[in-house]
Design a protein with these regions (language model features):
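Helix-loop boundary and gating motifs at the non-cytosolic
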Residues: 2-51, 197-203, 211-225, 232
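Helix-to-loop junctions at the C-terminal end of transmembrane segments
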Residues: 57-69, 246-258, 344
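Structural signature of the two symmetry-related core transmembrane helices
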Residues: 72-86, 261-276, 356
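Cytoplasmic helix-loop-helix junction between adjacent transmembrane helices
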Residues: 101-136
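Intracellular juxtamembrane helix-capping segments at the cytosolic ends
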Residues: 109-122, 299-313
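C-terminal membrane-cytosol helix-exit motif in multi-pass small-molecule transporters
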Residues: 162-182, 365-370
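C-terminal transmembrane helical hairpin of 12-TM major facilitator-type secondary transporters
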Residues: 260-303
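A late C-terminal transmembrane helix in Major Facilitator Superfamily
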Residues: 316-345
């Protein structure tokens, strides 16, 4: 294995373990607050502090990527997360707002720097496969993390999460090849990066909005369609499995064929697929198949976008675009559940209609951008 591939493998492995840490800690904190008797609005406000941390650190990420090596940024952030998680059992519950804010800051550093680092070290011919593996590994960690709550009672999950962060840091520190700071580019303001990559911003907001709405409301929608709570939860799990597994073949295709045409195809299939939800949910096997493929095709929009961004930008500018994308992710995640709730209140099939509408609008936007960049061809 070449030094370059070893570095990529180490980063992807460390990111999957970080995904476990995040997937464990997010529901853990909410459950502990619920157990202590706090209302949903308080729990939601605490969860929003993670997004506030993301918004706060994003403008500084391009400069950080210039000043420090990616390995140093990631390992120090992982050590910070270790300390923060171990502090939760000893800090008064109101102090958890500050801890959650700092978790958002250091988690954002890890995600932006790893995406930038992988793009910086991969060759163009394998860029999509590498980033598809990254997306799948991170998603796998997110999915498995909550399951660890079933085997660890009390305060143990906080220490378990800290231990996973430590493991990830040690793997990265001892195994990753040395790398210099990512670039010497002149850093631009964060808003400039929004205008430099408008399609990437739209794709990120779309993915975050529907992911947040789906995770919160898909089970409710399926139950309204006559599914039991267990069966509806299994349907959500099938969607998540598809979102993980299908990224690898999408990455393979994206390294061989026109990535923008694949993006348009995924957006079109996501639009049509969402419109089929009401029909498919009447036949369980069709619903499982549809959700499996829809989850994979929809998440592929994000995989293809981060690949396109990596092909177009380098160094601090790449980190800047990813930082701007993370802000759009936060915006999408904040408004997605609200839009979903309003849509479901207005229409029986409001959730799939909303998904189809947003995917359709993104398809039209991507088509317009493609024609503009190709001189109307």
């Amino acid at each position: 294995m070449t030094t370059q591939r070893l570095g990529q493998a180490v980063v992807i492995g460390a990111v999957m373990i970080f995904g476990l840490t995040y997937g464990l800690s997010a529901p853990l904190i909410s459950l502990r607050l619920h157990t202590e008797g706090y209302d949903e609005w308080f729990i939601g406000l605490n969860a929003a502090m993670h997004a506030v941390g993301v918004f706060a650190v994003a403008p500084f990420l391009p400069a950080l990527c210039q000043r420090y090596t990616p390995g140093a940024l990631i390992t120090r952030s992982l050590f910070a997360i270790l300390v923060l998680l171990c502090l939760f059992p000893f800090v008064p519950l109101l102090g958890w707002f500050a801890l959650r804010f700092l978790l958002g800051v250091f988690s954002e550093i890890i995600l932006v720097v790893t995406e930038t680092w992988l793009n910086h070290t991969t060759v163009e011919q394998a860029r999509a496969k590498t980033l598809a593996l990254y997306t799948a590994s991170l998603s796998l960690g997110y999915a498995i993390g909550p399951l660890l709550l079933l085997i660890a009672p009390g305060d143990i999950p906080f220490y378990l999460g800290g231990g996973l962060a430590l493991l990830s840091a040690v793997i990265l520190w001892t195994s990753a090849p040395p790398s210099p700071p990512l670039a010497e580019d002149k850093v631009s303001g964060i808003l400039r990066y929004v205008w430099m990559a408008p399609l990437a911003m739209a794709a990120t907001a779309l993915n975050a909005a529907l992911e947040a709405a789906g995770l919160n409301l898909l089970v409710v929608y399926a139950m309204q369609m006559g599914w039991s709570e267990q069966a509806a939860t299994e349907l959500l799990a099938v969607l998540m499995v598809g979102a993980i597994v299908l990224q690898l073949p999408v990455g393979w295709l994206a390294d061989k064929y026109d990535r923008h045409k694949l993006l348009l195809g995924c957006a079109a299939l996501s639009t049509v697929g969402a419109l089929l939800w009401p029909l498919a949910l009447n036949v369980p096997i069709l619903a499982w198949l549809l959700m499996f493929f829809w989850g994979g095709v929809f998440v592929a929009i994000y995989t293809l976008i981060i690949t396109q961004v990596g092909s177009r930008f380098t160094g601090a500018h790449l980190a800047g675009v990813y930082a701007a994308m993370s802000i759009m992710w936060g915006v999408g995640a904040l408004i997605g559940p609200s839009l979903g709730g309003i849509a479901m209140s207005a229409f029986t099939h409001g959730l799939p209609y909303l998904a189809a509408l947003l995917c359709g609008l993104f398809f039209l936007w991507a088509l317009w951008v493609h024609k503009r960049e190709n001189g109307g061809a």
